[in-house]
Swiss-Prot record:
A motif (Peroxisome targeting signal) lies at residues 419-421. This is Acyl-coenzyme A thioesterase 6. The gene is ACOT6. SUPFAM superfamilies: alpha/beta-Hydrolases. Keywords: Cytoplasm, Hydrolase, Peroxisome, Serine esterase. The active site is at 232 (charge relay system), 326 (charge relay system), 360 (charge relay system). One of its GO terms (biological process) is fatty acid metabolic process. InterPro entries: AB_hydrolase_fold, Acyl-CoA_thioEstase_long-chain, BAAT_C, Thio_Ohase/aa_AcTrfase, Thio_Ohase/BAAT_N. Pathway: Lipid metabolism; fatty acid metabolism. PANTHER family: ACYL-COENZYME A THIOESTERASE 6, ACYL-COENZYME A THIOESTERASE-RELATED.
Length: 421
């Protein structure tokens, strides 16, 4: 009997869905090598491989069979996705156009030899970023430049504004995936997109206030408030939004600072200066990558007090997602500062989830962990930290934690799924 690749779900699924991979029709205990590959929209090739052995019943099921080596080892049912590595070094896998899927090619080869063995079977898995029925609406409302993702059905839906960090213009893949779980999500650009400023020299909170107003006035968004999700620089912007703006009910921060960073923040007649940084303290790793961990001064030092975001003004619960091996800045330390400041002002202690061996760029599940890549703005190779297997596990758990937190505070669901890590 010829070997056959079995995929569940068959054919296509959403990127954040697990994929069950099995091979039938092998010889008992036959050694095989499985390979995956995909190309991003710019043609960059990503590949992974792992060696396996069929069981005595002539089958191979990646949920039960450990990898014997290759891009990873051990029981890792989704390893052939998260272990994808770029053919050209320092390329990070991101989805630029969420309206099209990534096509993952899977191959089963005979044997464990370094040279590829005979091709036994192959299959393709198309991984979508828009679940069936999810709608994408470009937003050009006054100065606001964004993309709104709406779940199927009539709504209205609980609303979220999603902000990325300082390396991209409009980044939509996290928002599009989150909309598939019942949220109306606005992926918001704030520089380097269309007619927005090219550089982050000054940031005006009024722009983000208009985005909040847009969401609250949208007929498909359930008021009277929305939530915020921010990563890196987007995280301290979300802290400022939660502290100064009305209509915010919950905030999730992924590896964020408690001080305003990168550029001065303006709001009405107030200016919050940026946290002092010293680029002379940039370090170079043994691999030649830059790490910015030591460039940021301590926000608690007296000369930095004015840069601290007054998060004690916020009337919302916070969830801090922390990579304990974040090499961009001291995310765990910043989360501790936030907790102490909130409690010192009689506020609710924030939920903090710390993930060991996890770096800066915590993406939705099954994205290959980005330990180092060329920063889109700086044009330099930056080291972000993280151990691939642990980081990948953290991404799966964090994605569920984020959804649980938002469902609880936007929909009033009280069941909380505790972290497995």
């Amino acid at each position: 009997m010829a070997a056959t690749l079995i995929l569940e779900p068959a054919g296509r699924c959403c990127w954040d869905e697990p994929l069950r991979i099995a091979v039938r029709g092998l010889a008992p205990e036959q050694p095989v090598t499985l390979r995956t590959s995909l190309r991003d929209e710019e043609g960059a090739l990503f590949r992974a491989h792992a060696r396996y052995r069929a069981d005595a019943r002539d089958e191979l099921d990646l949920e039960r069979a450990p990898a014997l080596g290759g891009s990873f080892a051990g029981l890792q049912p989704m390893g052939l996705l998260w272990a994808l590595e770029p053919e050209k070094a320092l390329v990070r896998l991101v989805k630029r156009d969420v309206r099209t899927p990534f096509a993952v090619e899977l191959e089963v080869l005979d044997g464990h030899d370094t040279e590829p063995g005979r091709l036994l079977c192959l299959a393709q898995n198309k991984r979508d970023f828009l679940r069936p029925g999810v709608r994408r609406e470009p937003v050009r409302a006054g100065p606001v430049r964004a993309a709104l993702f709406l779940p199927p059905d009539e709504g209205p839906f609980p609303g979220i504004i999603d902000l990325f960090g300082s390396s991209r213009g409009l980044c939509e893949y996290r928002a599009s995936l989150l909309a598939g779980h019942g949220f109306a999500v606005l992926a918001l650009a704030y520089f380097r997109f269309e007619d927005l400023p090219e550089d982050l020299n000054d940031v005006h909170l009024e722009y983000f206030e208009e985005a909040v107003d847009f969401m609250l006035q949208h007929p498909k968004v359930k008021g009277p408030s929305i939530a915020l999700l921010g990563f890196s620089k987007g995280g301290d912007l979300c802290l400022s939004m939660a502290s100064f703006l009305k209509g915010i009910t919950a905030t999730v921060l992924i590896n964020a600072c408690v001080a305003n960073t990168v550029a001065p923040l303006h709001y009405k007649d107030m200016i919050i200066p940026k946290l002092v940084d010293d680029l002379g303290k940039v370090k170079i790793t043994k691999s030649g990558f830059l790490t910015f961990m030591d460039t940021w001064s301590n926000p608690l030092e007296e000369h930095n007090h004015q840069s601290l975001v007054p998060l004690e003004k916020a009337q919302v619960p916070f969830l801090f997602i922390v990579g304990m091996d974040d090499q961009s800045w001291k995310s765990e330390f910043y989360a501790q500062i936030a907790s102490e400041r909130l409690q010192a002002h009689g506020k609710e202690r924030p939920q903090i989830i710390c993930y060991p061996e996890t770096g800066h760029c915590i993406d939705p599940p099954y994205f290959p962990p980005s330990r180092a890549s060329v920063h889109a703005v700086l044009g330099e190779a930056i080291f972000y930290g993280g151990e691939p297997k642990a980081h990948s596990k953290a991404q799966v758990d964090a994605w569920q934690q984020i959804q649980t937190f938002f469902h609880k505070h936007l929909n009033g669901k009280k069941s909380v799924k505790h972290s497995k890590i």
